[in-house]
Amino acid sequence: MKRYLAVAVVLITLCGSGHAVASRNVSLQKARRGVAQAPADYYPPRGDGWRRKRPEQVGMDSALLEQAVRFARTKESRIPRDFSTQVETFGALLGPLPKERGETNGMVIRRGYVVAEWGDTRRPDPTYSVAKSFLSIILGLTVDRGMIKDVHDPVRKYIDDGGYASPHNAKITWQHHAQQTSEWEGAMWGKSHDFLGVEGFGKGRREPRTLQEPGTFYEYNDVRINRMALSLLRVWRKPLPEVLKQEIMDQIGASGAWRYHGYFNSDAVIDNRRMASVSGGTRWGGGLWINTRDEARFGYLILRKGRWRNKQIVSEQWIQMATRPSAAKPDYGYLWWLNTGRKAWPSAPETSFAALGYGSNTIWIDPEHDLVIVWRWHQGSPDELIKRILAAIKPTEASR
């Protein structure tokens, strides 16, 4: 009798173990099927075929989103359409300007799909200091390729054109340039680092001050960013617009409508070839002229951490570094504006960040909500539109 009981116990145990193994196998199969069935990120094709989805298809309320778009349409920039106040505001021009700008326009990209679009989003216009964030990504490419070994390296290690020869400028690193803490001293294309004088700098002129140690003091300064752009040109040994086109814009299917202009006097001679050095904005003319749709593609590339389909265009590590708060200015990274402490956009997650330019021109990126908003030629804080768009996201659909 005891023998039969022992056999029964063994059989029950084996059956139970078999059932557990079978259950685990079924669970693993379901998990594998779940991974296989998870939708891949959508990327728009080259051209105008960017897929649209109804707001409800991506977890948004169409009525609330439409209200947000109607609000955006009412916030036309007060900047004259003909740029007639440009010299008064910024000082003497060095480069071209279009005859007039477009009207306010924008796009909302949710989970990769167009869910809202207003105004003329195909018209290329100057995007002013949004160009700085494009330069940030070019710097990232340069580091990724090993052309710059370390962002903390002194620039003078790579550049020997006299711009970093002084004891003060010799201390400047690539990171200092990218965080706008370089305190570079000198002149670029007829504009001095100190921004002194009405003729050269208009209402943007500044008062004299003592230079600080590189890396310790933040100052928004286009002359210094123009110095960084020239240094990048010398490292690449080809025009940065070519680098941008070949390495980034062509890769993400951007249109051929954008142009990155230098100044009339910003040519440099490299390898017996005359090349225009570009600027970090359109303060003195020139700069990046681009349409909203191409800016949305660029923003989507950054949202996807530098990846476009199966190609890592700029490293995820660089995107992380570029959007990390700097010590001297916690709401600024490597030429990207951050929402540290939710001070810039109180309605938005602290992890959101943006490329910003005069105008106002905005590429706002929100990884938490899988969202890109491009808004051109608007007045007021972008937060007023951001909070309305975020309100349109259904609570159960907040994240991807």
Region roles according to the model:
Residues 113-122, 184-264, 286:
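Catalytic-site signature segments of enzymes, centered on catalytic residues
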Residues 354-400:
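Structured C-terminal helix/loop/strand segments within mature extracytoplasmic catalytic/sensor domains
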